[in-house]
């Protein structure tokens, strides 16, 4: 690392870690470099805030915590150029990744690097004469990694016991729970729990009944995860590159495409697409002068059900709010206003992000171990 006009070796306390890109990123199908780094490097914390496809990972170095109003994210540099999100970079274009912690990085890169720096270098042109054309693609499948166990009969018993403790005899809303109803729900589970499917219609007398006080008592329990989350979804990745050298000019041209389907079952559309393109050219004009130019383009499209507005709340909140006997349909088979229904009729939201950068630079070597670099980037 160069400090002004002198250089020094980086000690282990300054450089948190270097990534073996071949083993970490290239050996497995990943949607973006951030997710690929999760759990692979000491000192680097990568958290995916939700299971939403296309969501940016939250990255922190050594657990840095900022102020209440300020951020604590590290500075991300790709070929010495800052980018707003690591997700816009095609993992197949990465040649090396290094992590610098706050003290060393702030002295080099300034205040923006107070919480560390992620240094990413992209692939360059070939060192030997010739051209290499390559393609790699894969089809992978994903499922939910952690499923919360939704309470069934035990939730009914807890709710009823809480009401009885304060002198009540009936609990719930829309579909009520009484002591008699709870005992019949236990019988329903023993008799019908393994027989009635989640999509089977409701049957009066079997799944619910009306008591002497004209209250609807629900007996059948539901697992909202079945209605909200798919068992698996596909992801496809395609990468094409041309790498070579002709005379004193070396080059690397690459294209990438990611198509990912989300796990939300009732959504009309739930997908994420990313398009990447990059080019790097370098020419050794003389023994002491090298000219470099490059360009980077990234486009991200995300489509999802927008089911939260002024009259609705987060469907995932209502999954845990409603009791296990709250039905997915009315006794006539019409859908109730439940989380799955809200998402199935919601409008589709479109989120598009475009990023482009162009750069050019000169590398002057007047003598051995003395390199002078001039770089200009427009993004």
Predicted regions and their residues:
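Short, small/polar-rich motifs associated with maturation and membrane association
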Residues: 7-277, 290-291
């Amino acid at each position: 690392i160069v400090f002004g006009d002198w250089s020094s070796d980086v000690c282990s306390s300054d450089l948190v870690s270097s990534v073996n890109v071949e083993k970490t990123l290239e050996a497995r199908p990943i949607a973006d470099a951030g997710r690929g780094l999760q759990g692979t490097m000491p000192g680097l914390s990568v958290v995916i805030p939700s299971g939403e496809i296309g969501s940016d990972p939250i990255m922190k170095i050594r657990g840095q915590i900022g102020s209440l109003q300020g951020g604590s994210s590290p500075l991300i540099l790709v070929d010495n150029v800052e980018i707003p999100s690591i997700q816009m970079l095609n993992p197949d274009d990465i040649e090396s990744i290094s992590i610098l912690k706050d003290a060393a990085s702030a002295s080099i890169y300034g205040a923006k690097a107070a919480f560390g720096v992620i240094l990413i270098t992209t692939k360059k042109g070939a060192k030997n004469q010739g051209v290499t054309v390559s393609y790699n693609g894969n089809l992978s499948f994903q499922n939910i990694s952690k499923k919360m166990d939704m309470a069934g009969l035990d939730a009914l018993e807890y709710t009823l016991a809480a009401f009885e403790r304060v002198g009540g005899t009936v609990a719930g809303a829309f579909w009520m729970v009484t002591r008699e109803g709870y005992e019949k729900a236990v019988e329903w589970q023993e008799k019908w729990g393994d027989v009635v499917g989640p999509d089977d219609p409701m049957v009066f007398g079997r799944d619910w009944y009306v008591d002497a006080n004209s209250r609807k008592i629900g007996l059948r329990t539901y697992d909202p995860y079945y209605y909200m989350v798919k068992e698996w979804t596909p992801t496809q990745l395609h990468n094409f590159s041309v790498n070579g050298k002709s005379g004193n000019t070396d080059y690397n041209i690459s294209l990438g495409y990611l198509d990912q389907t989300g796990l939300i079952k009732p959504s009309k559309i739930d997908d994420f697409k990313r398009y990447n393109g990059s080019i790097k050219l370098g020419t050794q004009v003389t023994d002491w002068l090298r000219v470099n130019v490059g360009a980077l383009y990234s486009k991200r499209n995300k489509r999802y059900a927008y089911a939260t507005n002024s009259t609705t709340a987060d469907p995932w909140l209502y999954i845990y709010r409603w009791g296990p006997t709250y039905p997915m349909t009315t006794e006539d088979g019409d859908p109730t206003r439940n989380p799955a229904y809200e998402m199935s009729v919601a409008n589709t939201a479109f989120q598009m992000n475009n990023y482009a950068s162009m750069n050019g630079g000169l590398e002057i070597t007047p003598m051995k171990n003395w390199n002078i670099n001039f770089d200009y980037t427009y993004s």
